[in-house]
């Protein structure tokens, strides 16, 4: 009764009286709504306004005044929600029940927003977009599952590295099977590589490959951060969109995990629930994405999309420390490799890491059992190679353990490697930016290269430049410098690619060919990997073909044409005309047979003399007509004991030519009428004999020096004896590289007896720090030219020079090889020091110091001649510096 009286006294009594019939009316209206929906589907045109008009007072009665307060602001949302959520057979009532919170008595909530429009300037992804979206990653599929991973990586790396800096990773997906991700540094490089792959069918081991770009979603971090809060208000999904082969490819779990690491933890939703705030929300999303950490995002774009093959479960590939080299002040070309297996070898480490660059040094440390795992230090040629290896190999399993990789200590020198240069960077720009730190000695840079070497006069200037210029923008807004120390006397190219010395059968390339940008980059990365045996000739021709852009390919063709022209010109100078060039190979074979036959005592005709006669033409025939019977008899006498159809050997030809020359001199005075013709004939004969001498010179060399021991035998022996360290002695031979012999004989002798010293005991060590090395250099300059000597110390052999004077090893000393002493000094990073003379001296008239340096940057400056002769120094050696004290 009370409720009935309240209903009677309410202003809307009629409307509220009808609310008692609400359950039955709902059933009838639901049935009527179903009939209306069916009628509408069959072509009816009944207007749905009365249904919405009846819903409005019912909503106000159920929701109260709060619903009325929001009715004006949310009318558009309710109308759009009712239309979008209505389904056939359910009518508008079903849409109202599912979209209107007031029907259930709960607090009202705004209906979900449609997806906001893209921000101004954003590029839509997909094939239907007007502007092509950018991508840095290519997905390579249809790979053969039977090929080894290393060979597959090498072949793909060789195909795509010519387009720019890349990193490559193999993976496996359930849909595509074996795939590879090729990540480029710049989007234009990736686009150029894909265009070439589409222009011509890419084959690998007779198998066509499929190349597709991988687009990264714009603003992905903000969408992911707000996905949890908007999950409840997401509208029902529409029909599935057609497959987009060029859209964003869903990758495996490891990649999604890395993408999630870019978003801030527990980030609040940034979008306002109003359509009019969509543009502002996108601006906030962009600001939030920029604040997440651009260095990590750039590292992910450059080296991302790596699979988890070979990594332990749960390993996070992209962590806080994976900064780009220009952002990481700790980045050096030295890598620390931890958690290694005790049985790991240097060959295994080189095989695993050499694909990322040139490794100069590998040092493996194996602590005792129970004191930790083994670890190693790898020194790459430059910082780019080291960073590429660090990112790609972190967490990979070598042996049985997943390795840990970090940067090692830097080795400061006066020479800097500067990377990250743009193609238009000039020497003047480098000099202008780096000259402010100190005096520059040299700048080694070829226009178009992405790196340069800068040599300073002092170590302090190099250290200041390395610290201040790392990350400096030079060459454009998107390029920043990478700076690291390099070898003090390092040449521009690695030793294995030095143009000299070359074997006899190699040809030197022209300057335009060797300094071409793309070919230069090929030399720097990893052209040392041999092609696989399954790699057919047709594939090799395709891979070594022209895969660059039109401008680059034209440059390469020009350089190749210049190179071929130079080779043809050299060949023409060497072999004469085309007819001579066609018989060059038989001459080579006959020359080899001639060298063998001369050793056996048989003489054959010299092809070079025959060629000179043929090459001379008419002059040669005149020379033949001038031959007197007396000269013919002398020639026949010089070739006595041979067959008539045979010919003279090279030595006999020279001997005959000398006799003929002597014969001309003998008859020149009495026969003055023929003097001019005789002198001309003599010049021709001298030309004839000079050519075989020139071509025969390599044969008369003793032999090509191949080892450091052979090179040392060409030097003067300075001292031979035993170097003693603690309880070990090392037989050593010292050969003079430069300096005064008197310093050696004056300081390396026993003063009481006056005899030569046979033992030198190392009692001190000198740390290989730059200030101490500068002090040694200063003492050498003060003692020049007669106050110092530099010697090359190698292992003394029983059959070597001075071996007969080797002293007998004293009791208690263990004879060991010199390489053990070198390894000890390398490990200590020090040089051995001996005060001279041994035993001390009463005065300072004849005193000095001996420094024994292991192979290091300081010692290499005295072995440049050996490096030019041998190419590389593989034997263990030391450089001995003896300096006499100055008053």
From Swiss-Prot:
GO cellular component term, pick one: nuclear speck
Composition bias type Gly residues, residue spans: 83-94
Entry GO MF terms: RNA binding
SUPFAM superfamilies reported in the protein's UniProt record: RNA-binding domain, RBD, SPOC domain-like
Residue numbers of Phosphoserine PTMs: 107, 111, 261, 263, 549, 553, 559
Native organism: Mus musculus
Gene name in the database record: Rbm15b
Cross-link type Glycyl lysine isopeptide (Lys-Gly) (interchain with G-Cter in SUMO2), residue numbers: 210, 699
Modified residues (Phosphothreonine): 529
Gene3D superfamilies: 2.40.290.10, 3.30.70.330
Subunit structure as annotated in this protein's UniProt entry: Component of the WMM complex, a N6-methyltransferase complex composed of a catalytic subcomplex, named MAC, and of an associated subcomplex, named MACOM. The MAC subcomplex is composed of METTL3 and METTL14. The MACOM subcomplex is composed of WTAP, ZC3H13, CBLL1/HAKAI, VIRMA, and, in some cases of RBM15 (RBM15 or RBM15B). May interact with NCOR2. Interacts with NXF1, the interaction is required to promote mRNA export.
Basic and acidic residues: compositionally biased ranges: 22-34, 65-77, 570-613, 623-643, 668-700
Keyword set includes ATP-binding: no
Residue span(s) of domain RRM: 136-216, 333-410, 414-488
UniProt-recorded name of the protein: Putative RNA-binding protein 15B
Superkingdom in the source lineage: Eukaryota
One annotated GO biological process: regulation of alternative mRNA splicing, via spliceosome
Keywords, ordered alphabetically: Isopeptide bond, mRNA processing, mRNA splicing, Nucleus, Phosphoprotein, Repeat, RNA-binding, Transcription, Transcription regulation, Ubl conjugation
Bias type Pro residues, positions: 111-122, 234-243
Region of interest: Interaction with Epstein-Barr virus BMLF1: 719-887
Domain SPOC: start-end pairs: 708-886
Motif window: Nuclear localization signal: 590-594
InterPro entries linked: Nucleotide-bd_a/b_plait_sf (IPR012677), RBD_domain_sf (IPR035979), RBM15B_RRM1 (IPR034475), RBM15B_RRM2 (IPR034535), RBM15B_RRM3 (IPR034536), RRM_dom (IPR000504), SPOC-like_C_dom_sf (IPR016194), SPOC_C (IPR012921)
């Amino acid at each position: 009764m009370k409720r009935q009286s309240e209903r009677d006294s309410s202003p809307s009594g009629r409307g509220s009286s009808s609310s008692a019939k609400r359950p039955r009316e709902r059933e009838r209206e639901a049935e009527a709504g179903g009939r209306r929906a069916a009628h509408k589907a069959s072509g009816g045109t009944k207007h749905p306004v009365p249904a919405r008009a009846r819903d409005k007072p019912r909503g106000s009665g159920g929701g109260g005044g709060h619903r009325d307060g929001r009715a004006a602001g949310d009318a558009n949302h309710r109308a759009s929600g009712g239309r979008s959520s209505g389904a056939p057979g359910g009518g508008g009532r079903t849409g109202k029940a599912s979209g209107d919170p007031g029907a259930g008595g709960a607090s009202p909530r705004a209906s979900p927003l449609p997806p906001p429009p893209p921000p101004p300037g954003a590029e839509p992804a997909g094939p239907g977009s007007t502007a092509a979206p950018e991508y840095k990653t290519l997905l390579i599929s249809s790979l053969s599952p039977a090929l080894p991973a290393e060979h597959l990586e090498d072949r793909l790396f060789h195909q795509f590295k010519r387009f720019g800096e890349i990193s490559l990773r193999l993976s496996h997906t359930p849909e595509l099977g074996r795939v590879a991700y090729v990540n480029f540094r710049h989007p234009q490089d990736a686009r150029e590589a894909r265009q070439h792959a589409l222009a011509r069918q890419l084959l690998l081991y007779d198998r066509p490959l499929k190349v597709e770009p991988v687009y990264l979603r714009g603003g992905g971090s903000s969408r992911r951060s707000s996905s949890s809060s908007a999950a409840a208000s997401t509208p029902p999904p529409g029909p599935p969109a057609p497959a987009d082969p060029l859209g964003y490819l869903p990758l495996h779990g490891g990649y999604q995990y890395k993408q999630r690491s870019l978003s801030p933890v527990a980030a609040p939703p940034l979008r306002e629930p109003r359509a009019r705030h969509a543009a502002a929300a996108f601006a906030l999303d962009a600001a939030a994405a920029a604040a997440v950490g651009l260095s990590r995002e750039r590292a992910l774009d450059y080296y991302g999309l790596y699979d988890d093959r070979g990594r332990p479960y749960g390993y996070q590939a992209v962590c806080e420390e994976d900064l780009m080299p220009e952002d990481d002040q700790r980045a050096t070309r030295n890598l620390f490799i931890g958690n290694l297996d005790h049985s790991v070898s240097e060959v295994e480490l080189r095989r695993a890491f050499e694909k990322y660059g040139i490794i100069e040094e590998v040092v493996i440390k194996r602590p005792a059992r129970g004191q930790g795992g083994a670890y190693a230090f790898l020194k790459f040629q430059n910082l780019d190679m080291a960073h590429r290896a660090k990112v790609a190999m972190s967490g990979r399993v070598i042996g049985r353990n997943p390795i840990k990789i970090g940067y090692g200590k830097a080795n400061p020198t006066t020479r800097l490697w500067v990377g990250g240069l743009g193609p238009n960077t000039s020497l003047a720009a480098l000099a202008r930016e780096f000259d402010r730190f100190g005096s520059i000695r040299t700048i080694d840079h070829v226009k178009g290269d992405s790196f340069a070497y800068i040599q300073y006069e002092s170590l302090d200037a190099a250290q200041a430049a390395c610290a201040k210029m790392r990350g400096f923008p030079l060459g454009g807004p998107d390029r920043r410098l990478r700076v690291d120390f390099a070898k003090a006397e390092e040449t521009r190219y690695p030793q294995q690619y030095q143009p000299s010395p070359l074997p006899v059968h190699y040809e030197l390339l022209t300057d335009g060919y060797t300094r071409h940008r793309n070919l230069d980059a090929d030399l720097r990365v990893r052209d040392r990997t041999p092609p696989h045996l399954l790699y057919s000739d047709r594939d090799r021709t395709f891979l070594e073909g022209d895969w660059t852009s039109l401008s680059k390919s034209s440059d390469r063709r020009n350089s190749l044409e210049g190179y071929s022209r130079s080779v043809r010109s050299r060949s023409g100078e060497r072999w004469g005309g085309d007819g001579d060039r066609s018989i060059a190979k038989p001459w080579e074979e006959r020359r080899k047979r001639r060298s063998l036959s001369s050793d056996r005592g048989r003489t054959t005709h010299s092809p070079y003399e025959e060629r000179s006669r043929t090459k001379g033409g008419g002059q040669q025939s005149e020379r033949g007509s001038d031959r007197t019977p007396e000269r013919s008899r002398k020639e026949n006498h010089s070739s006595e004991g041979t067959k008539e159809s045979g010919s003279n050997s090279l030595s006999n030809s020279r001997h005959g030519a000398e006799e003929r020359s002597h014969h001309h001199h003998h008859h020149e005075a009495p026969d003055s009428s023929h003097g001019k013709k005789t002198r001309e004939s003599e010049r021709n004969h001298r030309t004839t004999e000079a050519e075989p001498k020139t071509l025969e010179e390599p044969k008369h060399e003793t032999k090509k020096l191949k080892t450091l021991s052979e090179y040392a035998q060409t030097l003067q022996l300075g001292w031979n004896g035993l170097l003693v360290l603690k309880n070990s002695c090392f037989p050593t031979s010292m050969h003079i590289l430069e300096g005064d012999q008197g310093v050696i004989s004056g300081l390396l002798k026993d003063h009481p007896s006056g005899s030569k010293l046979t033992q030198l005991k190392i009692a001190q060590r000198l740390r290989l720090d730059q200030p101490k090395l500068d002090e040694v250099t200063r003492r050498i300059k003060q003692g020049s030219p007669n106050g110092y000597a530099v010697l090359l110390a190698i292992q003394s052999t029983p059959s070597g020079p001075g071996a007969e004077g080797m002293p007998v090893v004293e009791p208690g000393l263990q004879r060991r090889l010199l390489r053990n002493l070198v390894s000890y000094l390398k490990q200590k990073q020090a040089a051995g020091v001996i005060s001279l003379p041994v035993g001390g001296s009463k005065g300072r008239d004849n005193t000095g110091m001996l420094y024994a340096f292991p192979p290091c940057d300081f010692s290499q400056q005295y072995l440049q001649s050996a490096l030019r002769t041998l190419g590389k120094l593989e034997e263990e050696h030391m450089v001995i510096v003896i300096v006499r004290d100055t008053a």
